[in-house]
Structures are given as structure tokens and as C-alpha cells.
Amino acid sequence: MSLDCYDVLIVGAGPAGSFAAELLARGGARVALFDGRPEGEPKACGGGVTAKALKAWPQLLNAVGRTITELDLYSPSSKRLHLVLDEPFAIYSRVAFDCYLRDRARDAGAHVFAEKISARKITRSDSGWRLKSDSGSEWTGAFLVAADGANSGIAKKLAGPLQPSDMEVAFGYRAPLPANNNAATVVAFLPAWVGYAWAFPRPDHISFGIATTQDAFEHGPLDQLLWQFMTGYYLQCEGQKVNFWHGKTDTPERADIEDHLRTSAERYAARIPGLSAKTWDSRTVSGDDWALLGDAAGFADPVTGEGIYYALRSAELFAEAYLSGAPQTYEKKWREDFGAELRRAAQMRRRFYGNFWGAPFTERMIEFARGHRGVKRVLGDLVAGEQGYVDLKKKLVKNALRPV
């Protein structure tokens, strides 16, 4: 049997896989891109794309989404900080966003296959890689790229498994927009838990969710907390004053909202990489004829869980390395480009969700920002993706010492 032979086989057609396929195909490589997700099935993700990513790849603005110019941050005690963003970000439905990037890859010349590829059906020989799909089709190629998410079996096979402490959990609901379409974008830090809740309005629905560490995850109480947040959000959209975490939860208004959401909201859940500093030091995400991209490589912010920027940037760095004839330089490229930033975020995670001057750091951070324009500006830059963690403490102190 004659098999099509490709230069690069890419498993996973999310942002990392599709963008890599586009860049490689435009550079002249013969690329096969495998999308194993059922058509129309969304990835469990808030869908936020930072201003930093939009500036780096302005073509993303052509995808159907919602541009966000204002954001409400809430402390664990529900103190509110309203940010008018100098650098807007965007929120996308992952179905629309992933489809847009996959179509760009196809238009660039990549061969896209709606086939699921599992790690146990991948074999390696002196001549390269052989992939077999669940349907029985086969392909061969010289180079293998895994971009199939945080649960990637291929990544486990090539780079070894991650520890539970290196993973985070996100879960939530896709729910209808408020009747008046008055949908604010909200991030609310959790009381007595590591992590935060979000409400991200998209063109036709709202993505609600909670992100926390896998070590801290307890579904029952966190799901109850999320429902409290969701019902409070809709009450707030109706003009009521709401304390998300400490208000009355047994009111008739909340019960009516919850009854409606129980029949209309769609649940989702996912694991997100949140690697420790120790793991960043030791993890290798590429070899002579293979590479990991995006979540499959562990490339996500350990504090916020944000991964789309790192998915796209890792794809770009890998494509640069491969097309230059030196794919082995990918490892050095990502470490020099964003490796130190993610390692610093890993070091900061415990402190970010720990205590500072007798209260949660997130509480103090929002308190300071409410009273100081300089600190507020730094937080706005952090949301935009323009402020990194390496010099965050220095920037906060420097701005806090300036006159208000």
C-alpha cells in the first residue's frame, strides 16, 4: 500500500497546531494537520486573547469575536476595580477561533484531515513516523508535532508525564446573554481558594468558569461557588447591587435565575498546564524529529491559565526553527523567548494567591489599585499581557511610591 509522505505531521488543530501548519505550509513544507475533535465541539476555554497577542498577530481580529475595552476585577471580599483598557483584548468562541485558524492553514496549503490520532497508533522507524487513525487510514512523515492539548498522550510518550501538581483545572458553563445584553466582562478572585472566576461575554453567549489548581480542586463546593457567582452576575446585569461571594444566596430572584440556567447552560471542563519552576527547569519539549507545542508542551501561564498567546508563539518559534533547517534550535528559542517568564510565574503562583499584610495578596492588590492610578495602570498592563511577572514586583513598588 502506498502512503502519502509528509515533511511534518501535526496532531491537534487548535491554535498551536493550525498556526504552525499555516506557517510551515507557507514556507514550502508538505504538512498534514489532524483535527480529531468532533465538528462543532468547542474546547473548554474562556477564549480570551490578550492585547499582546492581537498586536503580534493582527490577523486574529478577522475571526468572529468580541473586543473588550473594559474589565471589572473583584477581590475575594468583592471590592470592585473597574479598568478601562488602553490595550483592548478579545474574547472568541473557540469553535469560531479554531475554525478560522484551521481554514488559514488549509488555504496556505496544509492538508487537513478530520481524523483522531492516538499515541498508541503512532510508530517510529529509521525512516520517520507512521500514524494510523481510528478509522484505519495511515500517513507517514519525517517530523512529528504534538499540539493536542494538556492531556496529550503523544506528549506523555515523547516527553514523559506531568505530575498532578503541574496541572490546573478549569470548569464552567456556557450560558445565554442577559436579556438586556448588558454583559460586563468580569474576573473575580475566589475567597479562601486558589484561583478566580470569570464571566466572558461572546457574540452569542457568556462563558462562565472557575480556574484553580488540581491540588486544590473540589468540585462540589467550587461548583456551588460558581453558581453563586453566575446568579449574582445576572442580578448585577439587571441593575442590582451584588456581593458575589458574601451576599444572600437563597433569594427568590436567584432561584428563578438558577432554574432558568439549569435548563439552558452547557457545562464544560478541562485540564490546563500550570508547571512548577522545577518542572520548567527539567522539561524538554523537542527532539531530533519531534516537538510539542502549546498546552501539550505545558505552555500556559501558571497564575492565570492563559495559553493562547503561548500556543501561537510556540508555533511561530517552531516554524522559524524548522524552516531555517535547524528544528533542534526550537528548544533554545522558546526558553529564551518566554521560558523565563513562565518560570517566574510558576514561582509567583503561591505568593499571588497567598497572604500579604494580613489579607490575600489579590485583596491588597485591588485595594491599592483602587486608590492609586500607577498601580491600576500596572494591573491594566498585566491584563493586556504587556506586563510580565519578572519585573512585576518592582513595577508595583515603583508605581506605588509615586504620588497618586
Model-identified regions with their sequence ranges:
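Beta1/beta-strand and adjacent pyrophosphate-binding region of the FAD-binding site
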Residues: S2-G14
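Conserved hydrophobic helix-helix packing surfaces used for dimerization/oligomerization
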Residues: V8-I10, V31, W290
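Predominantly flavin-linked oxidoreductase catalytic cores and closely associated redox partners
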Residues: A13, G27, R104-N243, G298
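N-terminal Rossmann-fold NAD(P) dinucleotide-binding loop
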Residues: G17-S18
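Glycine-rich FAD pyrophosphate-binding loop
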Residues: A25-A44
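FAD/FMN-dependent oxidoreductases across multiple families
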Residues: A119, A216-A321, Q328-T329
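C-terminal helical "tail/cap" subdomain of flavin- and related membrane-associated enzymes
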Residues: E320-V404
